[in-house]
Regions:
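Hinge/lid segment of periplasmic solute-binding proteins
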Residues: 23-29, 98-162, 304, 372
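Short, polar/charged alpha-helical segment
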Residues: 25-26, 42-63, 404, 422
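Short, solvent-exposed loop/beta-turn-alpha elements that line the ligand-binding surface or hinge
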Residues: 29, 111-133, 208, 225-245, ...
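Long, aromatic- and glycine/proline-rich binding clefts that accommodate carbohydrate-like moieties
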Residues: 31, 303-307, 353-406, 410, ...
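Short, well-ordered beta-strand elements
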Residues: 31-42, 61-66, 89-90, 155
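Extracytoplasmic "Venus flytrap"/periplasmic binding protein-like
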Residues: 50-136, 175-179, 272, 276-280, ...
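Extracytoplasmic/periplasmic solute-binding protein
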Residues: 138-159, 164, 185-235, 278
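Glycine-centered hinge/linker elements that transmit conformational signals in sensory
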Residues: 189-195, 232-262, 304, 308
Length: 442
């Protein structure tokens, strides 16, 4: 049974300039349609709920939302997308699901929708979409199979996309005479020096729980420290010197972090920072608003924002969520209209003003947004370093990701030798890639 929240019962968000009504114009054929959408329980999509009533008011299209924790959402979609008649007209998907859904032909190529003059808004301005997000979230079939290129196609639009930034306690840094780290040497020094100077205070709060969270945490450091999971011919390079440095960095951060760090997911790590248990937090831009909410955060008013520190290169995370239309959707054209509306300039700004993550350059440049959320300018600048090849979004990634996550947890909690751990991952990954056919042409 779906848990459905009708958009007509939610609090209305900011008003839009009406471009069409349900009685006339492009939305008229779809007035009275009810779309069922699947969204994650996530700060961005909480903001979306506030603006959905305006979509219904403008278009006459009702929206019912099935909201689930994002890993549970992935499990539900894995089932629904295989059915002849699915429950969902529009889905939000985690970035690493892109390869699976495209490879299984479970989501629509968006070209036919953007070619239809009855559907596409001539003022949509796709060039304003943040290109790193669009490449990472939406494009498949190009370079390496998951990046843009001459053979690539668009299957989704970024919505709730994220990059990584560093949050830090301005009061703690001022008291200790520190500046926010711009490089990894300084970051790792501060991560352990701060707890030594202020007993009871962790250095960096980080996700590290066994499985996906430990893998994600490792990847946060692998890219800036110069590493990749594979080279350009799919040879595993995770066990390179750069991979070892990334694992060592994560272990240092967890060892010098707040109590219980090795079991933290992103919410637990963010909460540790919000409750004053850590001086830094390196993770998604999605957490910023919560740190300034005095009802949930003891550090409100004492939080600074900086770009993800650089190693041998500046390479922050690209990830988060996108929107796609399932192949088995009952109302694909109306779903496209909702997708287009939410990711339009007006829609993106409305969601951002409600606390969501912008997907457009123009939104980050908006004066009203920057006045309301002063961290927006820093986050906009950080996008220059967002790495669309931050992780390999291939069909085999789910199994590789799980292996990295469980093995990295052993490094963090059982002191498994780092080189031995990474060599094991590389060996198992090569066997998997052989099985998947990646070396058959070599």
């Amino acid at each position: 049974m779906l848990k459905l929240l009708s958009s007509t019962t939610m609090v209305a968000g900011m008003a839009f300039a009406t471009v069409a009504t349900a009685q006339e114009g492009p939305y008229a054929p779809y007035a009275g349609t009810t779309l069922v959408v699947n969204f994650p329980a996530h700060p961005h999509y909480n903001a979306v709920l506030e603006v959905l009533p305006e979509f219904t008011a403008q278009t006459g299209i009702e929206v019912e939302v099935d909201m689930l924790p994002y890993l549970d959402m992935r499990e539900r979609q894995t089932l629904e997308l295989t059915l002849d008649e699915g429950a969902y007209d529009l889905i939000s998907y985690v970035v690493f699901s892109k390869a699976d859904y495209v490879f299984a032909d479970q989501i629509h190529n968006l070209a036919p929708f953007f070619m239809n003059p009855r559907l596409v808004d001539p003022n949509y301005d796709p060039e304003d979409l943040i290109d790193g997000y669009l490449q990472n979230i939406g494009v498949a079939g190009g370079e390496k199979g998951y990046l843009p290129g001459p053979t690539g196609s668009l299957f989704g639009l970024p919505f709730g996309s994220e990059t990584s930034v560093m949050y830090y306690r301005t009061d703690v840094f001022e008291e200790l005479g520190l500046e926010p780290a711009q490089d990894y040497a300084t970051l790792l020094d501060q991560a352990c020096a701060i707890p030594a100077a202020m007993p009871g205070m962790g250095g960096v709060a980080s996700r590290a729980a066994s499985g996906h969270q430990a893998s994600h945490a490792f990847l946060l450091h692998l890219a800036p420290l110069g590493g990749r999971v594979f080279d350009d011919t799919w040879n595993p390079t995770i066990n390179s010197a750069e991979g070892v440095a990334a694992a060592e960095a994560l272990k240092t951060i967890v060892d010098c972090g707040p109590e219980g760090s090795s079991a933290f997911g992103p919410s637990e790590a963010a909460n540790a920072f919000a409750q004053g248990q850590a001086a830094m937090f390196i993770d998604s831009i999605a957490f910023a608003a919560g740190f300034e909410d005095e009802s949930r955060s003891t550090v409100a008013g004492n939080v600074g924002w900086a770009s993800h520190p650089a190693g041998v290169r500046a390479a922050s995370q690209t990830g988060g969520f996108g929107l796609a239309i399932p192949r088995n959707a009952e109302h694909p054209e109306a779903a496209f209209l909702l997708m287009q509306w939410l990711t339009s300039k007006q829609g993106d700004l409305a969601v951002a003003l409600a606390g969501g993550n912008p997907s457009r350059f123009s939104t980050y440049a908006n004066a009203e947004l920057n006045a309301k959320f002063p961290w927006s300018a820093t986050f906009g600048e950080a996008l220059a370093d967002a790495d669309p090849d931050w992780r390999p979004i291939i069909p085999a990634w789910g199994r590789i990701n799980a292996d990295i996550g469980t093995t990295m947890s052993q490094v963090l909690t059982e002191d498994l030798d780092i080189q031995e751990a990474l060599d094991g991952i590389a060996e198992r990954t090569r066997a998997l890639m052989t099985e998947e056919g990646y070396y058959i042409w070599q």
